[in-house]
């Protein structure tokens, strides 16, 4: 059993139902004065069990339930639009539908096989690369396209994954920081290389002008040096999924729902009463006023595993944890 903040459970309710995982949600309602009303427990059974006991609900409670579900669905839609979370936005290593195209050129575009980096050829004939292993794994997991990591070779065409796409791919803060550091190193090297070439040209101008074949040889060497400098490293910032796919090929994978039989998690809850039987808890920034107390009690239990959000998309991290416990 997994404990989690109530708002995280709410936002993930549809995916939890797909996995046939039970929900025990202690809900909270804020009055017009801003004070919290009495907490209301709410339980949702597995899909096959949810049919029992429905006849005893009053008409007013059914209306309340329906309006709440519509509100939750609307929240999910807004989140999906903003950061691309949901069942199709898993982190690296999640289970994927075996029938998804692996990048053989029939669906995702770009010939060749996935291991060869299908669809990653840049405008100048070189292949697009990324700056970190985490970004490469996230792209392969989400789009089925294998992409290489930059290995300090010139020339190179590098994809810089910008903020909105970082969220879409579920890149951690550490992964973002690693990309930033590598970009700084590249620009520093590029700047120092440009200064060195300028100094070399200055020394040549100050020296004696060569004659005959020597002059011809010197001109050719300078021309070759300028050509190498013009090739160098190209860095392309990418903000949207659409642009990324046009550069690397592939299509977004549709993840198969993971059932309760495939996950060790059978129940998720934000109730303090469930601390005694919980095996793990997931904590993240939350608006659930009861969660702080629940997490404090859970942290006192030596047999409960603790998991914390890394700062990425919380819903994606929560579902990823459930699928791998």
Swiss-Prot record:
Belongs to the orbivirus VP6 family. Surrounds and interacts with the genomic dsRNA. Possesses ss- and dsRNA-binding capacity. Its hydrophilic nature and capability to bind ss- and dsRNA suggest that it interacts with BTV genomic RNA. Residues 32-52, 61-79, 176-201, 210-226 have a biased composition (Basic and acidic residues). Residues 23-123, 176-229 are annotated as: Disordered. Pfam families: Orbi_VP6. GO terms for cellular component: viral capsid. Keywords: Virion. This is Protein VP6-B. Residues 106-123 have a biased composition (Gly residues). It comes from the Viruses. It is found in: Virion. It comes from Bluetongue virus 10 (isolate USA) (BTV 10).
């Amino acid at each position: 059993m997994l404990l989690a903040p109530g708002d995280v459970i709410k936002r993930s309710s549809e995916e939890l139902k797909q996995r046939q995982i039970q929900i025990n949600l202690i809900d909270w309602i804020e009055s017009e004065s801003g004070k919290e009303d009495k907490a209301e427990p709410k339980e949702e059974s597995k899909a096959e069990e949810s049919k029992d006991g429905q006849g005893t609900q009053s008409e007013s409670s059914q209306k309340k339930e329906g309006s709440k579900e519509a509100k939750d669905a609307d929240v999910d839609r807004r989140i999906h639009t903003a950061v691309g979370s949901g069942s199709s936005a898993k982190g690296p290593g999640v289970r994927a539908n075996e029938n998804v195209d692996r990048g053989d050129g029939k669906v995702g575009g770009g010939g060749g096989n996935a291991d060869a980096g299908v669809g990653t050829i840049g405008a100048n004939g070189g292949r697009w690369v990324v700056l970190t292993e985490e970004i490469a794994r996230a792209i392969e997991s989400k789009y089925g396209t294998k992409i290489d990591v930059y290995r300090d070779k010139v020339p190179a065409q590098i994809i810089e994954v910008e903020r909105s796409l970082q969220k879409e791919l579920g890149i951690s803060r550490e992964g973002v920081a690693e990309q930033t550091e590598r970009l700084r190193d590249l620009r520093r090297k590029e700047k120092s290389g440009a200064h060195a070439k300028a100094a070399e040209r200055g020394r040549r101008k100050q020296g004696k002008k060569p004659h005959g074949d020597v002059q011809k040889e010197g001109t050719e060497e300078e021309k070759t040096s300028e050509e190498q400098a013009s090739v160098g490293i190209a860095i392309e910032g990418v903000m949207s999924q659409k642009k990324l796919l046009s550069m690397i090929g592939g299509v977004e994978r549709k993840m198969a729902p993971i059932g309760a039989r495939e996950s060790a998690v059978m129940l998720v809850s934000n109730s303090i009463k469930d601390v005694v039987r919980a095996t793990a808890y997931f904590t993240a920034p939350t608006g659930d006023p009861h969660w702080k107390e629940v997490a404090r009690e859970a942290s006192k239990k030596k047999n409960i595993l603790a998991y914390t959000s890394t700062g990425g998309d919380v819903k994606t991290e929560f579902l990823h944890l459930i699928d791998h416990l």
